Amino acid sequence: MSLDLSTSLSPARPLESADAMEERLREIGAARYHDRHPFHHMLHGGELTRGQVQAWALNRYYYQCTIPVKDAVVISRFRDRATRIEWRHRLEDHDGAEGAEGGIDRWLILTDGLGLDRAYVESTEGILPATRFAVEAYVHFVRDRSPLEAIASCLTELFAPNIHATRISGMLSHYDFINPTVMAYFQRRLTQAPRDADYALRYVREHARTPEERAAVCNALIFKTQVLWTQLDALHHAYVLGHVPPGAFVPEEMR
């Protein structure tokens, strides 16, 4: 499932300015973001069965419910109050607030609509091992690397609105079991992701002051694209090629 991306990026060069770094970041996104993955092409093009879509939503839930954990870790890395305040809204975006639903609630509306038992989804017992390992690696990254790299790893949000728009239109067009209500998560992220990406980009442009720091920012983005890509590789291997590991969710048509 891996694509050869070596020819998609310009040759390595010192990043002598914030503009050069941003150009490099956008090259990385164009070449490595998971909108290029064959599993997403199948998902958005109506080529998956209901059971395969269930498997995707079930596994992706683990990523969604871990995002606020990751963001709490990011907040804990900063002594700067202004940065903590800015980042704090991300927790409410996903966890919700009193009287207001969040992204996790909206994702569960999707899994409910797909016919998955909510308690089973929330237990995460049916997810693929690779899903768990990839998502946990992301949390470890923001905990163990520099605060600058922790923020830089979130820069995949620069490229998220396009995939959300494609997903909304594609899935509504191709699947009779998909409706606007269950796609509410992606609709909300059309406005949330650009706001978050703008802040993260401003932050790394201001705080990555040396070529080495700018390279670290770019490598953090590469790492995050690998986290996302690995999850799709695992889904394709299990639910398209049919190699479901023991203990993982098995769609009805594969039983």
Curated annotation (Swiss-Prot):
Source superkingdom: Bacteria
InterPro entries: Haem_Oase-like_multi-hlx, PqqC, PqqC-like, Thiaminase-2/PQQC
GO BP, sorted A to Z: pyrroloquinoline quinone biosynthetic process; sulfur compound metabolic process
Gene Ontology molecular function, alphabetical: pyrroloquinoline-quinone synthase activity
Pathway: Cofactor biosynthesis; pyrroloquinoline quinone biosynthesis
Record family assignment: Belongs to the PqqC family.
Role description: Ring cyclization and eight-electron oxidation of 3a-(2-amino-2-carboxyethyl)-4,5-dioxo-4,5,6,7,8,9-hexahydroquinoline-7,9-dicarboxylic-acid to PQQ.
Protein name in UniProt: Pyrroloquinoline-quinone synthase
Organism: Cereibacter sphaeroides (strain KD131 / KCTC 12085)
